[in-house]
């Protein structure tokens, strides 16, 4: 009994200690889940931050990719435009060189000679030849001239015609003059080609000053205006 009486107070004295110990243990155990919950929250927040940072990084990467793609497209467009411009310039240079080469290869342009020019040259040469054979004096309207003409029907005898020059018709080698004279009271007009080979000599007797190029009015005037010694 003594032992039991001694044991009971000890047991009673030991019982509250165990609850305190248990309470301490419970306190530690209660602290541990709180720490674990805090750690879990921190881990969750870290995961969320990591996830958000990864999303933000992905957004930044996507923006950078878009900008890089846009820059690449711009660079490719600029390169294509530069290539097209270079191709156009090379084509223009090639065309210019081709035109220059074609112009150099072409023979020099020859001036076209018209039929009228040819006839003028022929008349000029014929006049030069006729003047070398027989010189022709300067004949003007109003001059009194003396012409020695060879008539084939008259056995090549020379006939002398004298008169006043009424007009002159310039036609190259076919230039003619019209001479007027009064014969037996009648006015006679004769046309002579001055470069004809049948005319052997043309001599200017005298010069008269007149105001007109053609003296056709002498037909209506008195015969004394058309007579001379």
Swiss-Prot record:
<keyword id="KW-0699">rRNA-binding</keyword>
<comment type="similarity">
    <text>Belongs to the bacterial ribosomal protein bL19 family.</text>
</comment>
<dbReference type="GO" id="GO:0005840">
    <property type="term" value="C:ribosome"/>
</dbReference>
<keyword id="KW-0809">Transit peptide</keyword>
<keyword id="KW-0150">Chloroplast</keyword>
<dbReference type="InterPro" id="IPR008991">
    <property type="entry name" value="Translation_prot_SH3-like_sf"/>
</dbReference>
<dbReference type="GO" id="GO:0009570">
    <property type="term" value="C:chloroplast stroma"/>
</dbReference>
<dbReference type="GO" id="GO:0003735">
    <property type="term" value="F:structural constituent of ribosome"/>
</dbReference>
<comment type="subunit">
    <text>Part of the 50S ribosomal subunit.</text>
</comment>
<dbReference type="GO" id="GO:0006412">
    <property type="term" value="P:translation"/>
</dbReference>
<comment type="function">
    <text>Located at the 30S-50S ribosomal subunit interface and binds directly to 23S ribosomal RNA.</text>
</comment>
<dbReference type="GO" id="GO:0019843">
    <property type="term" value="F:rRNA binding"/>
</dbReference>
<dbReference type="InterPro" id="IPR038657">
    <property type="entry name" value="Ribosomal_bL19_sf"/>
</dbReference>
<dbReference type="GO" id="GO:0003729">
    <property type="term" value="F:mRNA binding"/>
</dbReference>
<keyword id="KW-0689">Ribosomal protein</keyword>
<dbReference type="GO" id="GO:0009507">
    <property type="term" value="C:chloroplast"/>
</dbReference>
<keyword id="KW-0934">Plastid</keyword>
<keyword id="KW-0694">RNA-binding</keyword>
<keyword id="KW-0687">Ribonucleoprotein</keyword>
<dbReference type="GO" id="GO:1990904">
    <property type="term" value="C:ribonucleoprotein complex"/>
</dbReference>
<dbReference type="GO" id="GO:0009536">
    <property type="term" value="C:plastid"/>
</dbReference>
<dbReference type="GO" id="GO:0009941">
    <property type="term" value="C:chloroplast envelope"/>
</dbReference>
<feature type="transit peptide" description="Chloroplast">
    <location>
        <begin position="1"/>
        <end position="70"/>
    </location>
</feature>
<dbReference type="InterPro" id="IPR001857">
    <property type="entry name" value="Ribosomal_bL19"/>
</dbReference>
<protein>
    <recommendedName>
        <fullName>Large ribosomal subunit protein bL19cy</fullName>
    </recommendedName>
</protein>
<dbReference type="Pfam" id="PF01245">
    <property type="entry name" value="Ribosomal_L19"/>
</dbReference>
């Amino acid at each position: 009994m003594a032992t039991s009486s001694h044991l009971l107070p000890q047991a009673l004295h030991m019982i509250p200690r165990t609850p305190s110990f248990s309470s301490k243990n419970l306190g530690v155990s209660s602290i541990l889940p709180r720490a674990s919950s805090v750690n879990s929250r921190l881990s969750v927040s870290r995961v969320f931050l990591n996830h958000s940072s990864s999303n933000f990084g992905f957004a930044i990467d996507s923006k950078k990719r878009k900008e890089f793609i846009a820059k690449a497209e711009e660079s490719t467009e600029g390169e294509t435009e530069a290539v097209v411009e270079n191709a156009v310039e090379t084509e223009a240079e090639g065309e210019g060189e081709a035109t220059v080469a074609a112009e150099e290869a072409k023979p020099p342009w020859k001036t076209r000679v018209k039929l009228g020019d040819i006839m003028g040259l022929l008349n000029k040469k014929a006049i030069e030849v006729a003047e070398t054979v027989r010189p022709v004096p300067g004949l003007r309207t109003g001059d009194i001239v003396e012409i020695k003409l060879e008539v084939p029907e008259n056995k090549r005898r020379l006939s002398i015609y004298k008169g006043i020059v009424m007009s002159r018709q310039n036609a190259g080698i076919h230039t003619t003059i019209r001479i007027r004279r009064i014969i037996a009271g009648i006015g006679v007009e004769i046309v002579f080609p001055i470069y004809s080979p049948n005319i052997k000599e043309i001599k200017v007797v005298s010069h008269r000053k007149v105001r007109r190029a053609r003296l056709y009015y002498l037909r209506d005037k008195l015969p004394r205006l058309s007579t001379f010694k």
